[in-house]
Amino acid sequence: MVKNLLLDIEGTVGSISFVKDKLFPYAASRYESYVNENYESDENLRELGKTPEEALINLRKLHAEGSKERSFKMVQGRIWKKGYESNELTSHLFPDVVPAIQRSLQLGMRVYIYSSGSVPAQKLYFEHSDAGNLLKYFSGYYDTTIGLKTECGSYVKIVGNSNPREWLFLSDNINELKAARKVGLHTGLVVRPGNDPVVDTSGFPVYNSFEILFTE
């Protein structure tokens, strides 16, 4: 019996286009000003470069690479924080997501988030969503500080002492699902508008909508 629902964000609960076309460009346009204003006080910036100039070069390089590097994601998240708090950014959720989360909670399940974005960035995403502040619905958040999403060890840590068969992980990424499946979690491949076409589902159940979670 599934007791814990573990959700990816990009391409699963929210659109890839919001992240690629809104969040990433928003951060990219503000790297220089952020470095100029925060280099001395931001530990993560100093980890990215021994000088402000080097930190900026590395920020732009990591951005271009689509990197999941921890310090880079922390800086990115702080830039987004300003955007959310100034109402320049409102995160996107597919309309079936909130009803599914509410239904899960009614059934006694716990809901968790696992994303490559930093935990602070995850919380901002759900605090400033187009469905309102949803933070009350989640029991926990995981990012790459616990491990990469494509590594089995990450899911071992998330599950902890609980039974992996009590967990369902939903993601649009086949490699993430394969890692979770090896650990014993239930898994589902989420297919959303704007996601990359899926040629081979690798035997994963396909979810075009979270409504499928509650159908007999």
Curated annotation (Swiss-Prot):
<feature type="binding site">
    <location>
        <position position="172"/>
    </location>
    <ligand>
        <name>Mg(2+)</name>
    </ligand>
</feature>
<keyword id="KW-0378">Hydrolase</keyword>
<feature type="binding site">
    <location>
        <begin position="115"/>
        <end position="116"/>
    </location>
    <ligand>
        <name>substrate</name>
    </ligand>
</feature>
<dbReference type="GO" id="GO:0005634">
    <property type="term" value="C:nucleus"/>
</dbReference>
<dbReference type="GO" id="GO:0005829">
    <property type="term" value="C:cytosol"/>
</dbReference>
<dbReference type="GO" id="GO:0000287">
    <property type="term" value="F:magnesium ion binding"/>
</dbReference>
<dbReference type="GO" id="GO:1990748">
    <property type="term" value="P:cellular detoxification"/>
</dbReference>
<comment type="pathway">
    <text>Amino-acid biosynthesis; L-methionine biosynthesis via salvage pathway; L-methionine from S-methyl-5-thio-alpha-D-ribose 1-phosphate: step 4/6.</text>
</comment>
<keyword id="KW-0460">Magnesium</keyword>
<comment type="function">
    <text>Bifunctional enzyme that catalyzes the enolization of 2,3-diketo-5-methylthiopentyl-1-phosphate (DK-MTP-1-P) into the intermediate 2-hydroxy-3-keto-5-methylthiopentenyl-1-phosphate (HK-MTPenyl-1-P), which is then dephosphorylated to form the acireductone 1,2-dihydroxy-3-keto-5-methylthiopentene (DHK-MTPene).</text>
</comment>
<keyword id="KW-0028">Amino-acid biosynthesis</keyword>
<feature type="binding site">
    <location>
        <position position="8"/>
    </location>
    <ligand>
        <name>Mg(2+)</name>
    </ligand>
</feature>
<keyword id="KW-0539">Nucleus</keyword>
<dbReference type="GO" id="GO:0043874">
    <property type="term" value="F:acireductone synthase activity"/>
</dbReference>
<protein>
    <recommendedName>
        <fullName>Enolase-phosphatase E1</fullName>
        <ecNumber>3.1.3.77</ecNumber>
    </recommendedName>
</protein>
<keyword id="KW-0963">Cytoplasm</keyword>
<dbReference type="GO" id="GO:0019509">
    <property type="term" value="P:L-methionine salvage from methylthioadenosine"/>
</dbReference>
<comment type="subunit">
    <text>Monomer.</text>
</comment>
<keyword id="KW-0479">Metal-binding</keyword>
<comment type="pathway">
    <text>Amino-acid biosynthesis; L-methionine biosynthesis via salvage pathway; L-methionine from S-methyl-5-thio-alpha-D-ribose 1-phosphate: step 3/6.</text>
</comment>
<dbReference type="InterPro" id="IPR023943">
    <property type="entry name" value="Enolase-ppase_E1"/>
</dbReference>
<keyword id="KW-0486">Methionine biosynthesis</keyword>
<dbReference type="InterPro" id="IPR006439">
    <property type="entry name" value="HAD-SF_hydro_IA"/>
</dbReference>
<dbReference type="InterPro" id="IPR036412">
    <property type="entry name" value="HAD-like_sf"/>
</dbReference>
<feature type="binding site">
    <location>
        <position position="10"/>
    </location>
    <ligand>
        <name>Mg(2+)</name>
    </ligand>
</feature>
<dbReference type="Pfam" id="PF00702">
    <property type="entry name" value="Hydrolase"/>
</dbReference>
<comment type="similarity">
    <text>Belongs to the HAD-like hydrolase superfamily. MasA/MtnC family.</text>
</comment>
<dbReference type="InterPro" id="IPR023214">
    <property type="entry name" value="HAD_sf"/>
</dbReference>
<dbReference type="InterPro" id="IPR027511">
    <property type="entry name" value="ENOPH1_eukaryotes"/>
</dbReference>
<feature type="binding site">
    <location>
        <position position="149"/>
    </location>
    <ligand>
        <name>substrate</name>
    </ligand>
</feature>
